[in-house]
């Protein structure tokens, strides 16, 4: 593992209250508690055109669905196309191919949004030559044969699109977005105004597509001056409105966000005119993590910050909710409910969304100094008689679900894990489904854009499998150990994903499992000691042994800390072994204590360069004598470019028997080897300088367990132990959300005496 960002301790600020526990109750129409659970995750690179490389950037951003709810259509700006997916079976999404915009226009045309109207999908296309020459169109495509039947010029650069319930009007936000690198006169780089001003384009859907008519709703006066309603509302730079997101109410009114202007506009779509304007306001938010310092510490605050809302949705015909992502001046890390009659705030989530991310291990600490979790998407819908709001976090890779039966007082229901950068949130109430499309795609980092489906109706939420209480920030659960004498207590330790090292106590008797304590690793003077701790062993006599991976071979070591977390001793690798390692060294440690003393067993992740190819090492260290004894471990092979096979964890199974995790470095649909093997140690120690290769025995193929979550299959299966209850537990390292979805899988596989026979 390479050097990563640096975590850890949540201090005095309380996490979200009882209403924002990681799971809550939501009653369906018949009073039964219902939850959404994931059914399938589909990487959209699998739906790419023939001839495109598997590594080409392919994304799913905004999506829509046909009237029967069985075909999903999404925008792929990176590929300059739209994609089609068969979701008739929510447990198995199928690709139906794509339609390239190159076939309809220019190579550089980019789709920005889509919506379905009857038998047609309307695709909003950005055709701008530059920021100062914005242009766009909407293509009307017959879904049955994917033929364009009409193209309507929009007169500017479009963003979002929405259709009203009766399919009488379509609204398109014409943003004419700013150039973040341009500096207007008297302003700073990226500031407004940057002309031309944006507006709203309304389509009246009378008759068929050939007779649809467009009507521009201007957001400035004909001479370019600001509308009085905008200045009266106190909007930022009202001479340059930049529409972001549009949404229709059930009764046909249109709500529009002006993100950079920090405003909300209501429009009478039938009359093509503005009916109300109000500011999104400013907020002071306390109890959040505001420093990118590798420490999860929600004691910071942002003061008097504009909300700068992105997505907007109607909770009913009176209230709207906004996801306050922020742009260049603001962002308040939550979502807000506004009363459209008065323009006043009725409810605000405050710090609870960010604290939720911390609680379930999805806090992206690297974004703390910017806009935090960045709530970007928001959608609302009624399922089985219950109204819900769905709020997506772009940076922490989740969607929070709320019961909005009382729209002025939303109640948190659950959190849904997503893949990286959830952009589109699409409720499909007719089929009890929610679809989320995530836009981040980087094949070189193993991060791929995907569409995920969730279905309502489960009695219990499947996520999270582990969470924290008592103000504890956590992540990178790449090590596990049972605590001697405690039937339901495990420990883990954080690695170099954070700037300080914490030993985490886990109560495995609960569902989800609960992290109940964090112990800081320090030196004798009480100063935090940062370690890339990849393995942990809880000693019967108290204290812990840590396996610490070094940036170079000689920096690998076993570290003894006492029960207070104070470092007592360091044991380096033997010089000859260290010389043959690079960055991937110690990965796991376990031990036995008997009449012969304490003996540590440690695994290194990759082969030592002087050893036979395909043979890894397991070492035994006699704490009393300081002697190392080494055994060879035969690794599986891989033919995948850039892949490798290595060891990630070790635990004692019984007298002379060890269990180890062997895994590849692949994730998602490419993951193949996530296994636990056992090895029997010889009764006689090998001769010094030799490396006898042990015979391994398959015990558990963990890959099906990882795939059973129906999400993105995690790469880093790194934690394993036998708990005091006799069960085998495993965990995945979420890499502190660095090139990872951030989801932690924590599972009980079954009884050790059955798995490790």
For the regions a protein language model found, what residue spans apply to each?
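Secretory targeting and sorting signals
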Residues: 1-29
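Sequence/structural signature of beta-propeller domains
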Residues: 28-757
């Amino acid at each position: 593992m390479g050097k990563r960002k640096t975590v850890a301790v949540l201090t005095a600020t309380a996490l979200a209250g009882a209403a924002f526990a990681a799971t809550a109750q939501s009653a369906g129409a018949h009073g039964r508690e219902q939850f959404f659970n994931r059914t399938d995750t589909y990487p959209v690179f699998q739906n790419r055109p023939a001839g495109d490389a598997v590594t080409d950037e392919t994304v799913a951003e905004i999506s829509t669905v046909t009237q029967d709810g069985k075909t999903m259509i999404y925008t792929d700006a990176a590929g300059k196309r739209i994609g089609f997916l068969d979701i008739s079976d929510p447990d198995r999404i199928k690709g139906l191919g794509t339609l390239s915009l190159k076939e309809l226009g220019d190579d550089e045309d980019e789709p920005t949004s889509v919506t379905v109207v009857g038998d047609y999908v309307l695709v909003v296309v950005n055709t701008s030559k530059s920021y100062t020459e914005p242009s766009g169109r909407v293509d009307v495509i017959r879904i049955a044969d994917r033929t364009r039947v009409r193209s309507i010029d929009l007169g500017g650069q479009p963003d979002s699109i929405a259709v009203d319930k009766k399919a009488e009007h379509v609204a398109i936000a014409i943003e004419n977005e700013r150039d973040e690198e341009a500096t207007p006169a008297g302003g700073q780089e990226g500031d407004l105004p940057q002309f031309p001003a944006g507006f709203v384009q309304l389509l009246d859907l009378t008759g068929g597509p050939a007779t649809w008519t467009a009507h521009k709703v201007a957001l400035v006066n004909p001479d370019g001056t600001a509308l009085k309603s905008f200045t009266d509302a106190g909007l930022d730079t009202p001479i340059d409105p930049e529409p972001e997101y549009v949404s229709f109410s059930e009764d046909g009114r249109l709500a529009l966000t002006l993100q950079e202007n920090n405003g909300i506009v209501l429009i009478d779509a039938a009359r093509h005119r503005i009916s109300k304007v109000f500011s999104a306001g400013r907020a002071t938010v306390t109890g959040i993590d505001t420093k990118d310092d590798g420490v999860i510490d929600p004691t910071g605050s942002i003061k008097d910050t504009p909300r700068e809302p992105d997505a907007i949705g109607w909770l009913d015909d009176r209230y709207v909710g906004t996801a306050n992502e922020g742009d260049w001046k603001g962002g308040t890390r939550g979502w807000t409910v506004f009363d459209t009659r008065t323009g006043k705030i009725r409810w605000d989530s405050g710090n609870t969304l960010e604290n939720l991310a911390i609680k379930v291990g999805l806090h992206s600490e690297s974004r703390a100094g910017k806009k935090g979790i960045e709530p970007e998407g928001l959608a609302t819908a009624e399922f089985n008689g219950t109204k819900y709001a769905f709020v997506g976090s772009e940076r922490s890779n989740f969607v929070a679900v709320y019961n909005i039966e009382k729209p002025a007082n939303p109640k948190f229901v659950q959190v849904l894990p997503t893949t990286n950068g959830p952009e589109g949130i699409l409720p499909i109430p007719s089929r009890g489904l929610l679809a989320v499309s995530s836009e981040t795609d980087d094949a070189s980092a193993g991060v791929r854009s995907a569409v995920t489906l969730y279905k309502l109706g489960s009695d219990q939420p499947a996520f999270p499998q582990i969470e924290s209480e008592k103000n504890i920030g956590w992540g990178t659960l790449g090590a596990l150990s049972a605590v001697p004498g405690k039937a339901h207590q495990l420990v883990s330790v954080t690695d170099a994903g954070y700037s300080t090292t914490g030993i985490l106590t886990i109560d495995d008797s609960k569902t989800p499992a609960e992290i109940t304590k964090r112990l800081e690793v320090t030196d004798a003077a009480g100063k935090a000691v940062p370690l890339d701790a990849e393995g942990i062993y809880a000693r019967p006599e108290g204290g812990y042994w840590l396996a610490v991976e070094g940036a170079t071979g000689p920096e690998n070591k076993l570290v003894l800390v006492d029960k207070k977390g104070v470092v007592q001793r360091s044991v380096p690798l033997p010089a000859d072994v260290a010389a043959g390692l690079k960055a991937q060294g110690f990965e796991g440690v376990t031990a036995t204590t008997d009449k012969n003393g304490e003996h540590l067993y440690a695994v290194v992740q990759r082969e030592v360069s002087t050893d036979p190819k395909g043979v890894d090492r397991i070492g035994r260290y006699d704490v009393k004598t300081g002697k190392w004894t080494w055994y060879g471990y035969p690794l599986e092979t891989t033919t995948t470019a850039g892949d490798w096979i290595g060891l990630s964890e070790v635990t004692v199974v019984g007298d002379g028997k060890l269990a180890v995790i062997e895994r590849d470095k692949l994730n998602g649909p490419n993951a193949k080897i996530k296994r636990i093997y056992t090895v029997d140690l010889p009764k006689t120690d090998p001769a010094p300088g030799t490396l006898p290769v042990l015979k391994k025995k398959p015990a558990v193929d963990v890959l099906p367990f990882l795939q059973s979550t129906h999400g993105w299959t995690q790469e880093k299966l790194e934690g394993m132990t036998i708990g005091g209850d006799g069960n085998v537990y495993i965990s995945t390292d979420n890499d502190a959300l660095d090139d990872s979805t951030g989801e932690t899988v924590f599972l009980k596989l079954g009884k050790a005496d059955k798995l490790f026979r």
